[in-house]
Amino acid sequence: MAKKGNISSRNLRISDQIQKDLAEMIQRELRDPRLGLVTLQSVTLTPDYAHAKVYFTVLGADAAETEAILNEKAGYLHSLLFKRLHIHTVPTLHFHHDTSVEHAIEMSRLINEANATRSKDED
C-alpha cells in the first residue's frame, strides 16, 4: 500500500471520493456470488489522475479470484464512476489485494509466540 506523503490535497480528496464511491458500487452493483466481503483499504492515484491502484481485503472468498473478478469488472466500475464524479479524467482502475493486514496478524502471532517462549524460559 502506498504512503500518502507528498500528495496534493486535491489528489487525496479525489482518492477518498473514489474509495467511498467504489465501496458502495461494489456492494450494490456487483452481485457476483464469488465475491466475498470486500473492504477497500485505500486508493492511490497517479499524479496525472490516469490510473488508480485500489487496495482491498476480502473475507469469505479467495483473494486471487476476487482480484481477478474486480479487475474484470473494472471497466464497468469505471463507467459508473464517470457518471458520479465531476472531474475531467476518471482514472483507469487497477485492483490489488492488500496483504498488510495478513502481515500484521502474522507479526502479532510471532511476537506473542516469542513472548510465550520467553516466559517459559524465565520460569
Swiss-Prot record:
Keyword field: Cytoplasm, Ribosome biogenesis
Cell compartment(s), UniProt: Cytoplasm
Domain of life: Bacteria
Cell division listed as a keyword: no
GO biological process, one term: maturation of SSU-rRNA
Name of a matching Pfam family: RBFA
Chief location bin: cytoplasm
Coiled coil spans: none
One of the record's GO molecular function terms: ribosomal small subunit binding
Claim: Coiled coil is one of the keywords in the record: no
GO cellular component, one term: cytosol
Family designation: Belongs to the RbfA family.
Reported function: One of several proteins that assist in the late maturation steps of the functional core of the 30S ribosomal subunit. Associates with free 30S ribosomal subunits (but not with 30S subunits that are part of 70S ribosomes or polysomes). Required for efficient processing of 16S rRNA. May interact with the 5'-terminal helix region of 16S rRNA.
Subunit annotation: Monomer. Binds 30S ribosomal subunits, but not 50S ribosomal subunits or 70S ribosomes.
UniProt name for this protein: Ribosome-binding factor A
UniProt source species: Cupriavidus taiwanensis (strain DSM 17343 / BCRC 17206 / CCUG 44338 / CIP 107171 / LMG 19424 / R1) (Ralstonia taiwanensis (strain LMG 19424))
Gene designation per UniProt: rbfA
